[in-house]
Amino acid sequence: MAKTKSGGSTSNGRDSKGRRLGQKLGDGQFALAGSIIYRQRGTKIHPGENVGIGKDHTLYTLIDGYIKYAIKRNRKYASAFEERK
């Protein structure tokens, strides 16, 4: 006979891993064409010049160049330029 009652099981105690979202390249950094600039859910930052947007709203460069972030009309934009601006 068991001296003490068996402990109950729990259905808690798990957590999902973080999604590694956010800025991957900063302002003024050099990026090769196709480099990911920003991973996001929704358009927190919009694509500017020479920057494309993926189906999961990831921003990536279309040319080799320097990254520039700007705010225009209450929207944040990420752009890429061949020369540093």
UniProtKB/Swiss-Prot annotation:
One of the record's GO cellular component terms: cytosolic large ribosomal subunit
Biological process terms in GO annotation: translation
Disordered: region residues: 1-26
Name of the protein in its database record: Large ribosomal subunit protein bL27
NCBIfam families: L27
Pfam families: Ribosomal_L27 (PF01016)
Organism per entry: Mycoplasma mobile (strain ATCC 43663 / 163K / NCTC 11711) (Mesomycoplasma mobile)
GO molecular function terms listed in the Swiss-Prot or TrEMBL record: structural constituent of ribosome
PROSITE patterns the record matches: RIBOSOMAL_L27 (PS00831)
